[in-house]
């Protein structure tokens, strides 16, 4: 799935597929499924704005957004810091919900179980 989202007035492409967990692991040496489970727990506890979320949760959102953007556009810098530098400090969190929705859509079961 590909989608273009606007971050601080800039159009940014994002892409998800079965390859994304591998890209995340290769980029950050971490498991995206474990990271997202922890992030979800932080979001559910707080149920608030980015200002109230734990730093670890915000970092997972940044990492996932970066991987999805890099996957959609390989010309994006290889360093996440260089990519994040083009946005104001909290701008990336404005698309966090869209990014998580894209991730969830990619993960849902496409066939109905027979039993």
Where are these regions (language model features)?
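N-terminal first-folded block
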Residues: 21-22, 26-28
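Generic secondary-structure boundary signal with a strong preference for alpha-helix termini
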Residues: 20-21, 41
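Charged interaction scaffolds used for protein-protein
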Residues: 1-11, 30-54, 59, 71-115
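Short linear motifs in exposed loops
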Residues: 15-17
